[in-house]
Amino acid sequence: MKASELRSKDAAELGQELESLLKAQFGLRMQKATQQLANTSQLRNVRRDIARVRTLLTEKAGK
């Protein structure tokens, strides 16, 4: 997800997005542990999306 898409959302929507990304990350980690995950780059992408959302939440909290 692009940062420009995330910037248009408010804090509540970002919180929901963060929750869904954390659930997705957990599912991907479980798939990796059981060796069912073929595309391991998905983990990296989700982790970076989580960082983007958390950064924007921090920015919005400071304003």
Swiss-Prot record:
Signal sequence annotation: none
Origin: domain of life: Bacteria
Spans through the membrane: none
InterPro entries cross-referenced by the UniProt entry: Ribosomal_protein_uL29 (IPR050063), Ribosomal_uL29 (IPR001854), Ribosomal_uL29_CS (IPR018254), Ribosomal_uL29_sf (IPR036049)
GO CC, any one term: cytosolic large ribosomal subunit
Keywords: Ribonucleoprotein, Ribosomal protein
GO molecular function: structural constituent of ribosome
GO biological process, one term: translation
Keyword hit for Ribosomal protein: yes
Tagged with keyword Ribonucleoprotein: yes
Family, as annotated: Belongs to the universal ribosomal protein uL29 family.
Protein name in UniProt: Large ribosomal subunit protein uL29
Source species: Bordetella petrii (strain ATCC BAA-461 / DSM 12804 / CCUG 43448)
Gene: rpmC
